[in-house]
Design a protein with these regions (language model features):
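C-terminal beta-signal and adjacent terminal beta-strands/loops
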Residues: 221-293
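Residues on the lipid-exposed face of transmembrane beta-strands in outer-membrane beta-barrel proteins
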Residues: 27-31, 82-88, 134-140, 154, ...
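Surface-exposed extracellular loop regions of Gram-negative outer-membrane beta-barrel proteins
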Residues: 1-13, 20-26, 145-156, 175-199
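Outer-membrane beta-barrel signature, preferentially recognizing the C-terminal barrel domain
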Residues: 47-102, 119-132, 141, 258-261
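Outer membrane beta-barrel strand-and-loop segments of large Gram-negative receptors
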Residues: 75, 94-151, 158-175
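Repeated loop/turn-to-beta-strand initiation elements of outer-membrane beta-barrel proteins
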Residues: 36-39, 90-96, 144-148, 186-192, ...
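Transmembrane beta-strands of outer-membrane beta-barrel pores
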Residues: 1-6, 43-49, 58-59, 90, ...
Length: 293
């Protein structure tokens, strides 16, 4: 990829030039051991660009003490990923991976130097990130009544800051999920979904435990023309993320509130389309005689 940009600011009377030539290869080798076992090695180089909101320099006030602003001088991030994967019988999959991200970008919170009461959420390229982890996925079926998908990820990450406002941190992070479908009868199906984010480091933040539990039940009539389902999401209201990090030596704590707990009832009725029905064909009493002519 070759990119050349030129930015002209009439207000500041400045010109900013930026150009680069980058190659982003993707290489993979797959070896079929037998019909049930497959192993593969992959490498990929990628680029990640900030969206417009992160580049927008204008301030967005959420209160008289807090505002957010983008950074038009942000650079893209470059990602290198190496992985070793193994798959068994299309039901068990595991991958060991190493990911290196240079100049990762995002928004971080600072105390306003002009007024210490104010908090500023400012975008920038703050960290170089190295992550070593393992991902596991297992699908199995128990008889005719249960289908289960189990996934898990464990990662050890290192965050190297390029600004004095943030210290270098490193640590573990892991998450697991369990997705179950229970076939109680030919027309009645139950659902159970569990997701747990174990306390650890995620995107530089030190997060507390977040647990999600969803339950559901679905009924389909004999002719499959009607489906009635009921679903309860975030049953215990424990999925809200809570995390913290240090900015300029001051601990920033965040307790996000998302109204994710709800009950959903759905009715789907298939009525049909009378316009797609074939029109009847009428024949006269002497149609057979006419066809002989």
């Amino acid at each position: 990829e070759y990119t050349y940009t030129k930015g002209l600011s009439y207000t500041l009377n400045t010109i900013n030039n930026n150009h680069y030539l980058r190659v982003f290869p993707a290489v993979g080798i797959e070896y079929l051991i037998n019909n049930s076992n497959t192993i593969s090695i992959d490498y990929s180089g990628r680029i990640k660009r900030p969206n417009f909101q992160l580049l927008d320099p204008f301030r967005w006030y959420t209160s008289k003490y807090d505002y957010s602003e983008g950074n038009p001088f942000m650079k893209p991030s470059y990602i290198h990923n190496v992985s070793l994967s193994y798959m068994y019988n299309n039901s068990f999959y595991t991958k060991m991976y190493f990911t290196k991200t240079n100049k990762d970008f995002g928004k971080m919170v600072f105390l306003d130097s002009e007024n210490i009461q104010n908090q500023v959420e400012r975008a920038g390229n703050y960290f170089d990130i190295s992550a070593l982890g393992i991902n596991i996925e297992y699908n199995f079926q128990l008889g005719y009544w249960l289908e289960t998908n189990l996934t898990g990820d464990i990662t050890y990450s290192s965050y190297i800051s390029n600004q004095t406002s943030f210290k270098n941190v490193r640590g573990w992070g892991s998450d697991f999920s369990l997705d179950n479908s229970f076939f109680l009868s030919k027309r009645l199906t139950g659902f159970l979904y569990i997701e747990d984010d174990i306390p650890g480091y995620y995107n530089y933040r030190k997060a507390k435990n977040a647990f999600l539990l969803n339950l559901g039940l679905s009924y389909t009539n004999k002719n499959k023309t009607m489906i009635v389902s009921i679903k309860a999401e975030d049953l215990f209201k424990t999925s809200n993320p809570k995390y913290s990090y240090y900015s300029n030596g001051i601990k920033q704590k965040f307790n996000n509130y998302y109204d994710s707990q709800h009950l959903e009832i759905t009715l789907i009725k298939k009525i049909g389309n009378i316009f797609n029905k074939a029109k009847p064909t009428f024949q006269s009493s002497n149609s057979e005689e006419r066809n002989r002519l």
